[in-house]
């Protein structure tokens, strides 16, 4: 009977423990080192988000471009 009482108390503690909110937990993005940034540069025609991702350093219309005037 004492064991049952202890188990019930422990279950009550687990059930009542606070759960961290997902909105307060932010996932930190890892930054690439200069070595990996250079190794992972994208070729002409590959999709991109900004100039730093392309081997030519030109991202136009979400594609790695060869020149600024290229459409």
UniProtKB/Swiss-Prot annotation:
<keyword id="KW-0732">Signal</keyword>
<dbReference type="GO" id="GO:0061844">
    <property type="term" value="P:antimicrobial humoral immune response mediated by antimicrobial peptide"/>
</dbReference>
<keyword id="KW-1015">Disulfide bond</keyword>
<feature type="signal peptide">
    <location>
        <begin position="1"/>
        <end position="16"/>
    </location>
</feature>
<keyword id="KW-0044">Antibiotic</keyword>
<dbReference type="GO" id="GO:0005576">
    <property type="term" value="C:extracellular region"/>
</dbReference>
<comment type="function">
    <text>Has an antimicrobial activity.</text>
</comment>
<keyword id="KW-0165">Cleavage on pair of basic residues</keyword>
<comment type="similarity">
    <text>Belongs to the LEAP2 family.</text>
</comment>
<protein>
    <recommendedName>
        <fullName>Liver-expressed antimicrobial peptide 2</fullName>
    </recommendedName>
</protein>
<feature type="disulfide bond">
    <location>
        <begin position="54"/>
        <end position="64"/>
    </location>
</feature>
<keyword id="KW-0964">Secreted</keyword>
<dbReference type="Pfam" id="PF07359">
    <property type="entry name" value="LEAP-2"/>
</dbReference>
<dbReference type="GO" id="GO:0042742">
    <property type="term" value="P:defense response to bacterium"/>
</dbReference>
<dbReference type="InterPro" id="IPR009955">
    <property type="entry name" value="LEAP-2"/>
</dbReference>
<feature type="disulfide bond">
    <location>
        <begin position="48"/>
        <end position="59"/>
    </location>
</feature>
<feature type="propeptide">
    <location>
        <begin position="17"/>
        <end position="31"/>
    </location>
</feature>
<keyword id="KW-0929">Antimicrobial</keyword>
């Amino acid at each position: 009977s004492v064991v049952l009482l202890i188990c019930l108390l422990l279950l009550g503690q687990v059930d009542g423990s606070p759960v961290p909110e997902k909105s307060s937990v932010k996932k930190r993005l890892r930054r690439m080192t200069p070595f990996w940034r250079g190794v992972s540069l994208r070729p002409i025609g590959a999709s991109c988000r900004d100039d730093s991702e392309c081997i030519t350093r030109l991202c136009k219309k979400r594609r790695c471009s060869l020149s600024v005037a290229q459409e």
